[in-house]
């Protein structure tokens, strides 16, 4: 049976994530309440294990030293209704879940590089504000994480290289938590 930790008790699981994980700042942005998600635990009043499922691409984080059988059972139950992308830290939970509960998604990305004609431009670097946000090509990913433009502008930030009124490049610091910031730069190339 899945036990969902009430949002107001999320502080009870922060101590269960001491070992640094891949995408750690995304996890801590959730634990600090900046982005939405759900936490499943072994005990509502005194959790010793947790699985956090973020709304952001359903990224899923497993707490340090969680019992592998509990993790497997929890993930299998969640997967009955949700697609998960589990971020696995072998230093936090050394044993991987048994084969068969995961769905392997084969992926092969091939990007053929062509010479890009470059030209000198004069661009201004502008902080993303409410007006500039509306013009950004990648704003939907920020809305996926923060649900509203206002939440993004309050809890994260970004910059654009702008020539006239045209955005040449977008740069987002979407997740700034646990003393680290995830920074992504998107260019036309």
Question: What are these model-derived regions, one by one?
Answer:
Residues 1-24, 109-151:
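Short amphipathic alpha-helix that is part of the acyltransferase structural core
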Residues 7, 31, 74-78:
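An N-terminal domain-start capping segment
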Residues 9-10, 53-57, 175-176:
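A short, sequence-level motif marking secondary-structure junctions
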Residues 25, 36-133:
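Acyl-donor-binding surface of acyltransferase catalytic domains
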Residues 29-32, 149-153:
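Short loop/turn motifs at secondary-structure junctions and domain boundaries
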Residues 35, 46-47, 156, 168:
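Short beta-strand-initiation
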Residues 52, 79, 136, 160, ...:
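Generic recognition of cysteine residues
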Residues 150-188:
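A conserved beta-strand-loop-helix scaffold within acyl/acetyltransferase catalytic domains
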């Amino acid at each position: 049976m899945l036990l969902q930790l009430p949002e107001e008790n999320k502080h009870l699981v922060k101590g269960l994530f001491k070992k640094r994980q891949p995408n750690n700042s995304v996890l801590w942005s959730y634990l600090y309440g900046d982005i939405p998600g759900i936490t499943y635990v072994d005990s509502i009043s005194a959790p010793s294990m947790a699985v956090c499922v973020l709304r952001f691409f359903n990224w899923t984080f497993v707490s340090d030293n969680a019992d592998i059988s509990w993790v497997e059972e929890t993930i299998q139950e969640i997967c009955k209704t949700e697609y998960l992308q589990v971020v696995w830290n072998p230093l936090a939970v050394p044993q991987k879940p048994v084969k068969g509960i995961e769905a392997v998604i084969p992926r092969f990305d091939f990007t053929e590089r062509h010479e890009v004609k470059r030209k000198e431009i004069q661009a201004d670097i502008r902080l993303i504000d409410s007006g500039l946000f509306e013009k950004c090509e990648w704003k939907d990913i920020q809305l996926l994480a923060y649900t509203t433009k206002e939440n993004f502008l309050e809890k994260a930030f970004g910059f654009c290289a702008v020539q006239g009124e045209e955005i040449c490049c977008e740069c987002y610091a979407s997740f700034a938590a646990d003393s680290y910031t995830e920074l992504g730069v998107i260019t036309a190339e």
